[in-house]
Amino acid sequence: MASIQRVTARQILDSRGTPTVEVDVTTGEGVLGRAAVPSGASTGAYEAVELRDGDADRYHGQGVLRAVGHVNDAVADALHGMSVLEQVAIDDTLRALDGTEDKSNLGANAILGASLAAAKAGAATLGVPLYRHLGRATARTLPVPLMNILNGGEHADNNVDMQEFMIAPAGADSFSEALRTGAEVFHTLASVLQDRDYSTAVGDEGGFAPDLGSNEEAVELILDAIEKAGYTAGSDVFVALDPAAAEMVEDEAYVFWKSDPDTERSSEDMVEYWAEWVDRYPILSIEDAMDEDDWDGWAMLTDAIGDEVQLVGDDLFVTNTKRLTRGVEEGCGNSILIKPNQIGTLTETLNAIETAHTHGFTAIISHRSGETEDTTIADLAVATGTGQIKTGSASRSDRVAKYNQLLRIEEQLGATAHYPRLDAFPLTN
């Protein structure tokens, strides 16, 4: 039966030195599943609740001993004796135990740790990789990496408003070739920045975080790096953006706090702004181009450019099927970012992906800015066949760990491995 014998949690540190939760699920046969939970910096208002201790004398209030205690007590008791092969039942039990819509009782960090650790124990029990356990025999699609090589916004201490400037090597023939392309462009960008006496210090997600003359200069630098690396922008490598617009809003106006704090922009202004960027640059995808509460603005944006570029809802949808369904009904966006800790269980995460695909939306598996060495999202991307992943730049071991896991999976799949190229972005075809 592979029943759960023991569930234990501990407090560990994430990539920012901030405490997070790690959970072990052990079966009666001694099989172990272990998962560590990430944490975001720019979090959506509608995400599941991450439980923190609030004790100013420990980790400046950011400790997670309360969440750890919930796992070691209530969660351990509730899951004892359950089969690790019954993921839906496990997650239903966790949700019922918490009893809230936003996981605010036990904490999404406690619940997700247990959920993912159980899934890993299930895979280990069957003697198969996690991607095979979750995706069955048909799982063979490697994701196009959206590599965050220039950081701004909440992810960097610089004067760049946009949070992420990414490259998508969608012209490569395989995942390993795509990763090589991304790494080469990343290292070339370092040289481009150095030539202009810009800093090559990196932000939370491994991308460079220099002070620049404008947001536009960030894109121009990336295009220069693509060319100098020997690739062609718009066919080999594309640009993707995450402005994180929710961080730019005050009193229903959009303000570029770092570069232009005295100018207020309306939703209509932002739609015009992004349409102009899409016309000017080889942009494949824009995430969180509008605020999480600006449903009308999202609809306007989707109507304006939604037939030519991927418009991704992160803070808008927060991996939540209810918010995603509203977005579908109101014509807001055409893609969803998938972050398991936004919703709190693996089953709910999988349901969000299924809902997206049912309605013709793309889905992108994503890390958080505060990461660990846990590689679950790499397996999740292959298991669900989303065809896209966001897991940072080609630096920082917490980011590269996911890429290395995808390389291993590609090797395991051998000739059956599929790299979707531009097919992962149907609007571009």
Curated annotation (Swiss-Prot):
Cofactor: Mg(2+)
Any one GO BP annotation for this protein: glycolytic process
Subcellular location: Cytoplasm; Secreted; Cell surface
Cofactor note: Binds a second Mg(2+) ion via substrate during catalysis.
Binding, Mg(2+): 242, 287, 314
SMART domains: Enolase_C, Enolase_N
Pathway the protein takes part in: Carbohydrate degradation; glycolysis; pyruvate from D-glyceraldehyde 3-phosphate: step 4/5
Keywords assigned by UniProt, alphabetized: Cytoplasm, Glycolysis, Lyase, Magnesium, Metal-binding, Secreted
Catalytic reaction annotation: (2R)-2-phosphoglycerate = phosphoenolpyruvate + H2O
Broadest EC class assigned to this enzyme: lyase
UniProt GO MF annotations: magnesium ion binding; phosphopyruvate hydratase activity
InterPro entries registered for this protein in UniProt: Enolase, Enolase-like_C_sf, Enolase-like_N, Enolase_C, Enolase_CS, Enolase_N
GO cellular component terms listed in the entry, alphabetical order: cell surface; extracellular region; phosphopyruvate hydratase complex
EC number: 4.2.1.11
Binding site for (2R)-2-phosphoglycerate: 163, 339, 368-369, 390
Active-site residues per Swiss-Prot or TrEMBL entry: 205 (proton donor), 339 (proton acceptor)
Matches recorded under NCBIfam families: eno
Record function comment: Catalyzes the reversible conversion of 2-phosphoglycerate (2-PG) into phosphoenolpyruvate (PEP). It is essential for the degradation of carbohydrates via glycolysis.
Homology family: Belongs to the enolase family.
Name the UniProt record assigns to this protein: Enolase
Organism taxonomic ancestry: Bacteria, Pseudomonadati, Rhodothermota, Rhodothermia, Rhodothermales
